[in-house]
Amino acid sequence: MVLHLVPRWSASLFRASPRWKKTYSQRASAQLKWLGCPRSVYSPLACRAYSKVSGSPEVMLTPERYPVQRLPFSTVSEEDLAAFECIIPGRVITDPEQLQTCNVDWLRTVRGCSKVLLRPQTSEEVSQILRHCYKRNLAVNPQGGNTGMVGGSVPVFDEVILSTALMNQVISFHDVSGILVCQAGCVLEELSRYVQERDFIMPLDLGAKGSCHIGGNVATNAGGLRFLRYGSLRGTVLGLEVVLADGTILNCLTSLRKDNTGYDLKQMFIGSEGTLGVITAVSIVCPPRPKAVNVAFLGCPGFTEVLQTFRTCKGQLGEILSAFEFMDAECMQLVGQHLHLTNPVQESPFYVLVETSGSSAGHDAEKLTNVLEQVLNSGLVIDGTMATDQRKVQMLWALRERITEALSRDGYVFKYDLSLPVERLYDLVIDLRTRLGPRAKHVVGYGHLGDGNLHLNVTAEAFSQELLGALEPYVYAWTAEQRGSVSAEHGLGFKKKNVLGYSKPPVAVKLMQQLKAMLDPKGILNPYKTLPARA
């Protein structure tokens, strides 16, 4: 059976019937009119207004909501401001309006009260700033695009905010090896555009790519949508330049694919969330840009069918399978309710997004078509749509990428980023719906099925200590029973630092604390984050 391509919609909608439809219906065409903007425009962090509703109440200060005590750091004085002005003239920000954005996380769940924002442009300037802060015992909050989900990128109290926003230069790119060297403040989407013009892609893709910085991505060991194909940043990052707490510049900015000399120091800083040093430059290997990308968006009757569809795709698509995402019906409902996006397929209990990327358009499309025919005819899939045109591919991805934005409009969001055995991935969502009942507006699950990553979200009208108590530590204990991880890709930040023990043994936690004490004896780098306080 041959799937005929149609103009501008590279593959037809297919229905749960004996034969494929050769063209998409007028109904489907009308539904897809919203799919006209670039994928980046729909990034929840490219459009800050989505999460900062005009007239919304001020975010509660973090110490008022969470039981945390300020450590005995110094406070910023006029002399400190003068010293900073000498280091970075004209880039010391004390204006309250400008500071407001940097003191609040984009989810509007935590807020610090820093009185100064520093915007260095070079590693040497970062070094001088940290040297001064170390001498004065001033706590420092490194900040990239402020797109984190766990409160790791904003101050808890009055820490000095050290922004990498002006450290946004590409240092070098090699068009044979695909190795990119750049400053830490480069925005991921801009880097993606830069390397795509040279026929490469970034190994990392996130819904927040319009705002997040590559340095922050590395500092949090971000996973994202291409993890299934290209793996984690621990494998694609070749080298780092890092400024330590006392101002020492550690230059491990190698561009070598192989270097087996001594300890691999960069790995300490990948995922350290700015607690061991400030990443100022990154060397990363970029894969060649695929010649052909196909995306299918499918409706499945149950989670068992989602798993079986994944197994079929993984077995038959092999190396060209680059993403396998899932979302439940409530996710689709919220995307429609709050963002007015239309479901392009028949309503289903679950939805799956399958992406392939390879070097042969005809071969890849044929392989995907054959797989889709198989899952449709076997009843694993109720309905679906497929695209090979780049614009339409971006349109289908918007359904998945904008879930976070839709949730942020539904009220206060309790967010959990969990690694679980794939076969148990959705059980916790079902369990919590029963456990929470009407106390929660919505309990939804979506994420990267290909790597066992569940994004569990619970929405409520407002923050509730009672609801939080029903969720925690229950969610973490449940995850630990499955030998899962309490943080798959978002990091621990401020909100999850005290639950590290659910995923790591005491010996490992103690060793991490000792490493922190060795590299940052005064504890000035991103305090109150990532690690529980030492006893």
From Swiss-Prot:
Which of the residues bear the PTM N6-succinyllysine?
A: K115
This entry carries the following GO cellular component terms, namely: mitochondrion
The protein's superkingdom reads Eukaryota
Provide the alphabetized UniProt keywords: FAD, Flavoprotein, Metal-binding, Mitochondrion, Oxidoreductase, Transit peptide, Zinc
Give first and last residue of the transit peptide: 1-50
Q: Where does Zn(2+) bind?
A: H448, H455, E489
Tell me the compartments it is located in: Mitochondrion
- Could you tell me what reaction this enzyme catalyses? (R)-2-hydroxyglutarate + A = 2-oxoglutarate + AH2; (R)-malate + A = oxaloacetate + AH2
Residues reported to bind (R)-malate: R400, T404, K415, H490
Where does the FAD-binding PCMH-type domain lie? 110-289
Free-text activity regulation comment from the record: Activated by zinc, cobalt and manganese ions. Inhibited by EDTA.
Positions contributing to (R)-2-hydroxyglutarate binding: R400, T404, K415, N457, H490
InterPro entries to which the protein is assigned, alphabetical: FAD-bd_oxidored_4_C, FAD-bd_PCMH, FAD-bd_PCMH-like_sf, FAD-bd_PCMH_sub1, FAD-bd_PCMH_sub2, FAD-linked_Oxase-like_C, FAD-oxidored/transferase_4, Oxid_FAD_bind_N
What's its job?
Answer: Catalyzes the oxidation of D-2-hydroxyglutarate (D-2-HG) to alpha-ketoglutarate. Also catalyzes the oxidation of other D-2-hydroxyacids, such as D-malate (D-MAL) and D-lactate (D-LAC). Exhibits high activities towards D-2-HG and D-MAL but a very weak activity towards D-LAC.
Q: Which protein family is it in? A: Belongs to the FAD-binding oxidoreductase/transferase type 4 family.
Write down what this protein is called. Answer: D-2-hydroxyglutarate dehydrogenase, mitochondrial
